Amino acid sequence: MTTHNSQYSAETTHPDKQESSPAPTAAGTTASNVSTTGNATTPDASIALNADATPVADVPPRLFGSFVEHLGRCVYGGIYEPSHPTADENGFRQDVLDLVKELGVTCVRYPGGNFVSNYNWEDGIGPRENRPMRRDLAWHCTETNEMGIDDFYRWSQKAGTEIMLAVNMGTRGLKAALDELEYVNGAPGTAWADQRVANGIEEPMDIKMWCIGNEMDGPWQVGHMSPEEYAGAVDKVAHAMKLAESGLELVACGSSGAYMPTFGTWEKTVLTKAYENLDFVSCHAYYFDRGHKTRAAASMQDFLASSEDMTKFIATVSDAADQAREANNGTKDIALSFDEWGVWYSDKWNEQEDQWKAEAAQGLHHEPWPKSPHLLEDIYTAADAVVEGSLMITLLKHCDRVRSASRAQLVNVIAPIMAEEHGPAWRQTTFYPFAEAALHARGQAYAPAISSPTIHTEAYGDVPAIDAVVTWDEQARTGLLLAVNRDANTPHTLTIDLSGLPGLPGLGTLALGKAQLLHEDDPYRTNTAEAPEAVTPQPLDIAMNATGTCTATLPAISWISVEFHG
């Protein structure tokens, strides 16, 4: 996660950062020349799967991951609050756990993030009363270490999630990573494994996916490195970890964002050097409406098209990974772990940092090292939810290369779940598109043929208004259509033809299930603690025709999901 020390936040949609030519449109999408000012009830867009449609790939369960960092109130006051009325014997908030399960999260990256780069994992084990307090240099806070890997493992068992564990490559490195691996996954009989048993966890945690550092290209990162420095370091750590335990899946740090001056060359340098020992490379991208304070129309339209940037990001990193494979005469593809993505209004964080600096210059000081302060607690709009739904569509359409993803973060900190101190937990607008995909996108993903009117953006040129993805589980005969209208002004009516799905005997054999629409006439409307259901998906007006096709109208700035079965 990028801090104010970078030129921009970890997102890449600012028009000044674009190349002179428009970004390519999403794969499988063609732009029609239909006017966007026509009659919204007359179909002007179509989604179709032809009989010869081939799947992108199997939908990987890890695509629906999230992220818990020791940052703000994500851990303390989020997943862990011993004094809360719903807290269990471990101090975990049951109301938050219930929402995490409802969200459908499969895998959680922990404990950072920038935090991990000066974190000693040993500080978080053993009796809580013996754990030291430390200064967290990333977020300028005091870390109490009440939560550590043992506690988070217990939480993940209750949440039903896999753990993706990150190791410190900022102030530490090879030995600390090997010690933590032994502690976490070792069978009893060695020093660190026996310490785990003594701390109450008898069986190995069996954590398979490990991130070797976080955003090590960023000058804000404690111990940041050049591409060559990190390439050598990650190669040594990954090699040693795989000697210690076969079957691990190791993630190298990719660029912190597409705005970084070494974007692309960083990935090629790192992956070429450490190709044999790596399985994934990370991708990080955040987006926000840069004109949100004035509600500028052009900025909103650019924001709605953010998935164009994510598509280009995936293509660039995939190309670098392929070049590394060719340089090593290899056969395996390095997969992408998009382990930080979502909407983050980083301008608010930058303003907070500027205020603190100004106060310090005047001799005014806020609490220098606070414990779990309110940080990055963005409240999301209906438009934000549509954009996150659009980004999820993009991840699914590229799941042949993006085999893991973590929507950042999980609770309170730029999160779909908010938890009031000593109060209720509630769903943000962004909760709903993620949950629908996480719970119902199964089987194989398909990028349908899409014909769509175009919209003009300052950042990306002319792009299709409509984007969509289809998933289909042929064995269970269940499927899901996700679609968005990225047009800020005009509704569009879709004709949907899914007759080309494999295993169907013919047209008219599909039955519609639950169909939902997320849209608000005021795209800036939010949920709050006082009105937690102000923005929720509503039933979508859709019907199957005698020909086996469907028609549905998508208002401007909207997301839909349609469950179906054969």
UniProtKB/Swiss-Prot annotation:
Q: Where is this region: Disordered?
A: 1-39
Substrates-to-products reaction catalysed: Hydrolysis of terminal non-reducing alpha-L-arabinofuranoside residues in alpha-L-arabinosides
| Enzyme Commission (EC) number | 3.2.1.55
Compositional bias of kind Polar residues: 1-12
Residues under site feature: Important for substrate recognition: 344, 409
- Name the enzyme group at the top EC level: hydrolase
Q: How does activity depend on pH?
A: Optimum pH is 6. The enzyme retains full activity at pH values from 5.5 to 7.5. After exposure to pH 4.5, the activity is reduced by 40%, and no residual activity is detected at pH values below 4.5 or above 7.5.
Question: Which keywords does this Swiss-Prot/TrEMBL entry list?
Answer: Carbohydrate metabolism, Cytoplasm, Glycosidase, Hydrolase
Gene Ontology cellular-component annotations: cytoplasm
Task: Provide the GO MF annotations for this entry.
Answer: alpha-L-arabinofuranosidase activity
GO BP field: arabinan catabolic process; L-arabinose metabolic process
What the record says about family reads:
Belongs to the glycosyl hydrolase 51 family.
Name used for this protein in its record: Intracellular exo-alpha-(1->5)-L-arabinofuranosidase
Which species is this record about?
Bifidobacterium longum
